[in-house]
Each structure stands twice: as C-alpha cells, then as structure tokens.
Amino acid sequence: MIFQKKRKTAETELSIILADDKRTSEINTGVGFLNHMLTLFTFHSGLSIIIEANGDTEVDDHHVTEDIGIVLGQLLLDMIRERKSFQRYGVSYIPMDETLSRAVVDISGRPYLSFNATLSKEKVGTFDSELVEEFFRALIINARLTTHIDLLRGGNTHHEIEAIFKSFARALKMALSENDNDNIPSSKGVIE
C-alpha cells in the first residue's frame, strides 16, 4: 500500500510518501540528523518513506521536524485504516552501546504519548534534543496511537536518540504485522 500527502504552511513545505513495500527510501528533510534518524526508522520498521521537505531551518529545525511528524502520523493512520488485519500491540527494547530504550505501541485509536527520556545533552550537532519528543508527539497524536517511550539507560545523546527511534520502529513493525485471525484485534470489532 502506498500513501502520499503534501503539506504547505508559511513555515514548511512537505511531500511525503509512505509505503509498506521494499522500495528504497529517500529522505531529504533539510536536517542532517533527522535524515539519519528517519533512515534508521525505515530500516527497522520495514516501511519505506520518501520525504522532500523545505522549512525555515534558518530559524531552527522545530517547524520542519514537527510537521514531518504530523504528516507521517496522518499517513500511518491512513495505512492502519486500510489494513484488515494487524497485531495491534508491539514492544521493543533496543540497546545502543551504553543506552537502552523501550517502546510500547498500541494501535488503539486513542492518541497518547508518554515520553520518559531525559536526554544527556541539549544538542546533537545543531539538532535540538528536545525536538525528539516534539516529533514523536506530532506523529503519535496524528496516527492515533497509544505509545510509551522510555529511555532506561543513557550516556551518549546520539546513542540515546538512535535507540529511541529504533525501539519505536521495531515496536510499530510488530504492531502492524498481520495477526493469525485476519481481523481487527478489538472486542469492539473496530478501532477508530
């Protein structure tokens, strides 16, 4: 399945394609560190992403990072609504050398993010560490997921953020995988 959205505001202009196939991802956010994290996300989630983004990065990376999270969340919601079968729940622990991150995902239709991660430094290169939570909040709310992200052990800030992205990607992959009953895993029969 292939899903595409464009978003244009006074601050950003985005074109994003999300697919659950093996196409090559092409990520150009204008923010080097975010490109790196999203590349890792695609590898570990099994999803393909093509992003072309322009934003007011001369101000900072906030708007483009948050808007990419918004649009990716909307595309994930579109994908979830098209699927007739998925596991619903996913959990992943990822070590990255001295760091350890846990992500738990419920495709619930009830948007909630618990982000329990005190990152060691305020920046990785020029990227503000606080934007990691902003990205995930935008994605989770728009995808209507219940998600808990916990940084259990820290150290190097790059490693901390990388472990967070990888653990979320792996938990999402598990939650999106087909279930044995070929149905929506809810006693209500629907997830909205």
Curated annotation (Swiss-Prot):
It is found in: Cytoplasm. Transmembrane segments: none annotated. PROSITE patterns: IGP_DEHYDRATASE_1, IGP_DEHYDRATASE_2. Keywords: Amino-acid biosynthesis, Cytoplasm, Histidine biosynthesis, Lyase. CDD domains: IGPD. GO terms for biological process: L-histidine biosynthetic process. GO terms for cellular component: cytoplasm. It catalyses: D-erythro-1-(imidazol-4-yl)glycerol 3-phosphate = 3-(imidazol-4-yl)-2-oxopropyl phosphate + H2O. Its main location: cytoplasm. GO terms for molecular function: imidazoleglycerol-phosphate dehydratase activity. The keyword Iron-sulfur does not apply. Pathway: Amino-acid biosynthesis; L-histidine biosynthesis; L-histidine from 5-phospho-alpha-D-ribose 1-diphosphate: step 6/9. Its EC number is 4.2.1.19. InterPro entries: IGPD_sf, ImidazoleglycerolP_deHydtase, ImidazoleglycerP_deHydtase_CS, Ribosomal_Su5_D2-typ_SF. It holds the Pfam family IGPD. Belongs to the imidazoleglycerol-phosphate dehydratase family. This is Imidazoleglycerol-phosphate dehydratase.
